[in-house]
């Protein structure tokens, strides 16, 4: 299991976590806001975000920059990115994101915007918890796809429309397959290189869909090693 305290930054691998309506506790609970545009930044616009790590310390976010500096200071974060930003917590208000219309030519492409849900910085209100099967990943690094849960034992696409119950009683309503974008082609620490062929392959062979998104029907604690069984 993984959670990503600051949107579009590196996250942390977990053994056990509380799950509630907004998703895994602390997941995508903070983000950087561009003070000039008012938009919530992602690695679609700022690939550099993937080289920082979001940390939760006493309920507040801290960003570990590529040089090891840990900060929540707006001036320091702005200097790093070369734009005026502030670190903000999720609220009930929807965040606005942007994406290039053409992933092959981002510099020359128009950018479109959309609103995500409130209470956490998820891209879609239909996916508060993201799930990917090991078989679906092939040889791709799991970190390219930034899932919350990696499962074994079969094809996850067939679970759309069903409910999954964990051994501990958490119930997830699987609502949709997850549409992929240029994020999965971005470079990341640890030798993950920029690779548009990953996105091209997912677009060509899977109609741009990889992984499934779920809503939380019954909250509780979820741990690695538990089964998720259709009910």
Features from the language model and the residues they span:
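Metal-cofactor-dependent catalytic cores
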Residues: 1-231
